[in-house]
């Protein structure tokens, strides 16, 4: 573990390797994240065996315990994904993480939306309500045939279309959002405020803006190559 800690910096910690945790790890790997930069914490040895079979590191223990989090070098982690079995445990884990790592990004999966406020107070940066998202997609599927497959494609690293969040490039600064070619800008964040293409007029991109863009994965892979 000491050898592992020495190379951990800017890594991703996944607390809980159940269904959601395993999907998250696989998706990170599919998107190109180095397996050596992922560590999974779980209390079940069988879960860790499944995780390490994917090439990531495993740490046996309770993710709400500060000593376990310290072993995962949580203070210098890039982000922590919390996908534990119940929402109240998620709150406890989030509190423990935030007490050690005030700057680390914390992403939490919850099952009941009513716990969102408590998780915000505990220090969660991003909260994903799996039941709410699932319910919305189920409702959409009643009246449509193609929306759910499109959303699945959009969210998957293996999909044909990808949704990216990135800083505005120098060549884009000064241009209107509807004149940038090669991608679809669906959102722009300026000074912390989100502007969406479907509810706001085209905006001029400024230095420091964050763009949310939709583009083909083929184009993305070509740029990376």
Descriptions of predicted regions:
Residues 1-225:
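Cytosolic regulatory regions of ion transport systems
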């Amino acid at each position: 573990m000491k050898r592992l800690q020495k190379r951990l910096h800017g890594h991703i910690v996944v607390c809980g390797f159940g269904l959601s945790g395993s999907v998250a790890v696989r998706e990170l790997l599919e998107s190109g994240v180095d397996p050596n930069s992922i560590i999974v914490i779980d209390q079940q040895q069988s879960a860790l065996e499944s995780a390490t079979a994917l090439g990531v590191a495993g740490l046996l223990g309770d993710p709400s315990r500060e000593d376990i989090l310290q072993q995962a070098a949580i203070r210098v982690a890039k982000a922590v994904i919390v996908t534990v079995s119940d929402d109240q445990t998620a709150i406890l884990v989030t509190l423990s993480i935030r007490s050690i790592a005030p700057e680390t990004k914390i992403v939490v999966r919850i099952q009941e939306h009513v716990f969102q406020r408590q998780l915000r107070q505990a220090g969660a940066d991003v909260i994903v309500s799996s039941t709410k998202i699932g319910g919305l997609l189920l409702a959409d599927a009643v009246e449509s045939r193609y929306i759910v497959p499109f959303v699945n494609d959009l969210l998957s690293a293996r999909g044909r279309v990808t949704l990216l969040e990135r800083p505005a490039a120098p060549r884009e600064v000064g241009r209107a959002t509807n004149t940038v070619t090669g991608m679809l800008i669906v959102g722009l964040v300026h000074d912390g405020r989100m502007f969406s293409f479907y509810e706001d007029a085209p905006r001029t991109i400024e230095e420091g803006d964050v763009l949310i863009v939709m583009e083909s994965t083929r184009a993305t892979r070509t740029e990376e190559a």
